[in-house]
Regions:
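Short catalytic/metal-binding and nucleic-acid-binding patches
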Residues: 1-160
Length: 160
């Protein structure tokens, strides 16, 4: 039996180390709700992070210390996935990183930090989804999507 042809997650031929803005989604392993929960407070959905979620957030916000060419624009963590907007700047540094290296380092560092505190083997699915931001309107659309994500939690494709 032939193996199915796997769709490549990155755009073929695109240089992910060049200056650009990206919208990224990363899911938890097996889409488990391990990062926290959504709770209604005064009729409004709020995300309440678990200890794993706190570690993930802390790791994420410390990433620019390692990757000075990446600027975090917006971020939203939900029970089983996260979305973020990031700008890859073209600055003069010796070691230039791609979006995949940035995301890979984040997943590895957060995974290790979680394992140091608890006996969870895996917190992330393989790979990640990305969208290359094409213009200001596209950036605003994805910014708003992240901003309103917690309010749409019950309708979210990752709600499962």
């Amino acid at each position: 039996m032939e193996k199915p042809i796997r769709k490549l997650p990155r755009m073929k031929g695109f240089d992910y180390s060049q200056e650009d803005a990206y919208f990224v989604t990363i899911c938890s392993y097996e889409n488990k709700h391990i990062f926290g929960k959504i709770s209604k407070i005064n009729g409004v959905n709020n995300f309440l992070p678990s200890r794993i979620g706190e570690i993930v957030q802390d790791t994420f916000f410390r990433l620019p210390e390692r990757f000075s060419e990446f600027e975090l624009i917006h971020f939203s963590l939900l029970p089983n996935h996260l979305h973020f907007l990031v700008l890859k700047k073209d600055i003069d540094i010796q070691r230039k990183s791609s979006l995949s290296q940035f995301v890979g380092a984040f997943k590895s560092l957060s995974d290790r930090a979680v394992r140091n505190e608890m006996s969870i083997i895996k917190i992330w699915q393989k790979s990640f989804n990305d969208h290359i931001i094409r213009n200001e309107k596209d950036l605003q659309t994805h910014w708003l999507y992240i901003e309103e994500n917690v309010n749409r939690w019950g309708e979210d494709e990752y709600f499962l």
